[in-house]
Amino acid sequence: MTRYAAPGTEGAIVSYQSRYDHFIGGEYVPPARGQYFENPSPVNGLPFTEIARGTADDVERALDAAHEAAPGWGRTSVTERSDILLKIADRMEANLERLAVAESWENGKPVRETLAADIPLAIDHFRYFAGAVRAQEGSLGEIDDDTVAYHFHEPLGVVAQIIPWNFPILMATWKLAPALAAGNAVVLKPAEQTPASIHYWLSLVADLLPPGVLNVVNGFGVEAGKPLASSPRVAKVAFTGETTTGRLIMQYASENIKPVTLELGGKSPNIFFEDVWARDDDFRDKALEGFTMFALNQGEVCTCPSRALVQRGVYAEFMEAAVARTELIKPGHPLDTDTMIGAQASNDQLEKILSYLDIGRQEGAKVLTGGERIEHDGELKGGYYVQPTIFEGHNRMRIFQEEIFGPVVSVTSFDDFDDAVKTANDTLYGLGAGVWTRDMNTAYRAGRAIQAGRVWTNCYHAYPAHAAFGGYKQSGIGRENHKMMLEHYQQTKNILCSYSPKKLGFF
């Protein structure tokens, strides 16, 4: 066990600044209106830094810097851009522990996750797109003996990126790595709940990028996010967050006919067929671990498997074991490497989760375990902690249909394959799903039948850089990750060239 010291205390490997301004044009600049807001740690509910409160004036200044930098960055050779991304990855790897502690303190998640997943994945995403852009090629089409169609990949120019609070550094990386690799300049707005860890990351890597290529404007959605998303000066808007906000982002961008990538909410089903229980072996144990994935990152994941569907013939035995497995999840100090579940990211999110715990009870759902806030004493007093909770009910309940974004799973049974698929698809969302079975025919058929952008099969919560990610239905538009993302941040230029000296013959 390792217990990291809180940032800024004796023995700490991380120190946050007392104040962070906007990062514009390669330097920190104060907010145009001189306003700041406090940023509390979910670990104890206490402010640890203050953040510049951005407005439209700050957004315009950032766009000025981005537009000045974009042409030069777009003309920079692919080799040089790739090398810079690799240097960013190397710098992050050299400071992995510091980044992990910084993010855990600001977001509340267990440091075991940031050490093993969040930061290593972010590093790998930069390396992946550094390689992908080197391998990308245009195309040539021979129309006839004298006519050739050339196709070139050109950057969009200046793009807007709005980042969520559940994975501050990783979600920024998902957007930044392909955008920068493709030759774009970026204006990024972090979530108002978690802006500081982005600035800590910037303190490590900002010197590697030309001034103006990456600009960060802090602030709240209406004050900074709206003017950024609605600006005619951006060529694309990429957003990750809840569906209601995504709908607004789409409206803002549509006013200027700008493309959007939206990674939105989910209510992902995790389906356990009865053959999972056929033998008491490693696979059964793996499936039980798969059930508990609803508590990963405190359930603050868009693809959280927040609905579990268990085949009726094994339901009682499976759920007895699943409840026991869930109760082994260890809460505690987020900076302790033994802690398995930390704090919710904000007090607002804590209150939302607690309200859904009440809703579930009012609907008649049965609490199989959990269902309460965790009240810690000592240095965790005032933090935002919730017990992993299992509800038993039916798919028409609000707790089955609405995104809670907390460590809460709603469980029901199904009769057969068709019943499982019908229940899985009975939702407005379609971001992720899980299928657990020993029969690969069942696995394949279920994966194709479920209306979701990603279907994990005998696994869950894996996010490799080279696997496309995105939603069906109201879970979003577009994809993230995979080399296809380069083209999402590019436009295709066609030069149709005739080498014939003869006349066209029209007139």
Swiss-Prot record:
Record EC number: 1.2.1.3
Binding-site list for NAD(+): 219-225
Keyword Protease applies: no
Enzyme class: oxidoreductase
UniProt keyword terms in alphabetical order: NAD, Oxidoreductase
InterPro entries membership: Ald_DH/histidinol_DH (IPR016161), Ald_DH_C (IPR016163), Ald_DH_CS_CYS (IPR016160), Ald_DH_CS_GLU (IPR029510), Ald_DH_N (IPR016162), Aldehyde_DH_dom (IPR015590)
Name of this protein: Probable aldehyde dehydrogenase
Species of the source: Streptomyces coelicolor (strain ATCC BAA-471 / A3(2) / M145)
